[in-house]
């Protein structure tokens, strides 16, 4: 038994080290790739100063943090709702953040500062997450809870479409493209949003014990002495914060929160002590690679990154559904 535990621990360490190395390689690729390939040896040149340090570095950091946040949000929500198919986009949390953002643009008539827009996006994500948690407390079946989340997402999407369709504001039309997901407008002025993500990401990665208990089910967690009301609400706030900040920075990006935790679980990383940091690293890798594809797929334009993640993630999602039905 002790030998098996040691083998499992070594295997987990190898996984985390491998993912860390892949994050480093994906970061280097993101900094080099673009309309002009800039090798690391040219990063200190005048061209490198502009393209790498002023344009690509803030974008790469934002992609890395948002990918980690979305994957962690998916892992936390799957433990919270005891449902392996939940994720922020599928349950409408991302759309809730979008509604908060568009409401801020409408009510503020485009005059609100960036930090106020970010806070409104966070508030929208929190409201939808709290509504979902309210549904979960009514002991709905997993399928009904999923349907409730999908319905909330559709309602939020409809509200955004109505607002954009009837608006004459150029800002709201731009938001329609932005809600498809993209990092094209990220620069150092959004650094406060990146900083706002870091402490929550670190805190979530340290909460393996309550999440392991929650993953056992509400009854088992209560029998083990976990204060359910406190931890559920705290994790809901943290998840809403991560999703809201991510949407404020890059728009709605789907499937990262669903696919990444599933893939890692299929690889044997079921303990949240390993799953949480693994999700953060793997989410960062996936979104960095998707961002590189979005930048390089078209010669004279940039694909919305939400399109790339949906194209790659939807087939995986269907496969997971079929696998869970067996």
Curated annotation (Swiss-Prot):
Membrane topology label: Multi-pass membrane protein
Keywords attached to this Swiss-Prot or TrEMBL record, sorted alphabetically, are: Cell inner membrane, Cell membrane, Membrane, Transmembrane, Transmembrane helix, Transport
Cited Gene3D superfamilies: ABC transporter involved in vitamin B12 uptake, BtuC
The answer to whether UniProt assigns keyword Cell inner membrane to this entry is yes
Locations listed in the record = Cell inner membrane
Q: What are the GO cellular component annotations?
A: plasma membrane
A single GO molecular function term of this UniProt record: vitamin transmembrane transporter activity
Residues annotated as transmembrane: 15-35, 61-81, 88-108, 112-132, 146-166, 184-204, 240-260, 274-294, 302-322
The answer to whether keyword Transmembrane helix applies is: yes
Extract the Pfam families matched here: FecCD
Q: Which GO terms describe its biological process?
A: cobalamin transport
Q: What does this protein do?
A: Part of the ABC transporter complex BtuCDF involved in vitamin B12 import. Involved in the translocation of the substrate across the membrane.
Which HAMAP family does the UniProt entry name for this protein?
A: BtuC
Q: Which PANTHER family match?
A: FERRIC ENTEROBACTIN TRANSPORT SYSTEM PERMEASE PROTEIN (PTHR30472), VITAMIN B12 IMPORT SYSTEM PERMEASE PROTEIN BTUC (PTHR30472:SF29)
Give the quaternary structure.
Answer: The complex is composed of two ATP-binding proteins (BtuD), two transmembrane proteins (BtuC) and a solute-binding protein (BtuF).
Q: Which family does it belong to?
A: Belongs to the binding-protein-dependent transport system permease family. FecCD subfamily.
- Protein name, per record: Vitamin B12 import system permease protein BtuC
């Amino acid at each position: 038994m002790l030998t098996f535990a040691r083998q499992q621990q070594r295997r987990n360490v190898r996984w985390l080290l491998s993912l860390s190395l892949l994050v480093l390689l994906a970061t280097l690729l993101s900094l080099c790739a673009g309309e002009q390939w800039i090798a690391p040896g040219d990063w200190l040149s005048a061209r490198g100063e502009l393209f790498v340090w002023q344009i690509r570095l803030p974008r790469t950091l934002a992609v890395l943090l948002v990918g980690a946040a979305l994957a962690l949000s998916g892992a936390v929500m799957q433990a919270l709702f005891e449902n392996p198919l939940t994720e922020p986009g599928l349950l409408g949390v991302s759309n809730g953040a979008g509604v908060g953002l568009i409401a801020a643009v409408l009510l503020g008539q485009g005059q609100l500062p960036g930090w106020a827009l970010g806070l409104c996006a966070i508030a929208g994500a929190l409201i939808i997450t709290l509504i979902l948690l309210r549904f979960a407390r009514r002991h709905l079946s997993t399928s009904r809870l999923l349907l409730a989340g999908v319905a909330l997402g559709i309602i939020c999407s409809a509200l955004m479409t109505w607002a954009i369709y009837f608006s004459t504001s150029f800002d709201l039309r731009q938001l329609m493209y932005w809600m498809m997901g993209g990092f094209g407008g990220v620069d150092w002025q959004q650094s406060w949003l990146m900083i706002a993500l870091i402490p929550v990401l670190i805190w979530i990665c340290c909460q393996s014990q309550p999440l392991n208990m929650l993953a056992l089910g509400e009854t088992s967690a209560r029998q083990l002495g976990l204060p359910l009301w406190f931890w559920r609400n705290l994790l809901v706030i943290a998840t809403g914060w991560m999703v809201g900040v991510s949407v404020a920075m890059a728009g709605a990006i789907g499937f990262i929160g669903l696919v990444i935790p599933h893939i890692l679980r299929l690889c044997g990383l079921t303990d949240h002590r390993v799953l949480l940091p693994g999700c953060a690293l793997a989410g960062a890798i996936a979104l960095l690679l998707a961002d590189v594809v979005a930048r390089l797929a078209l010669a004279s334009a940039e694909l919305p990154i939400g399109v790339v993640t949906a194209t790659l993630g939807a087939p995986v999602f269907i496969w997971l559904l079929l696998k869970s039905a067996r």
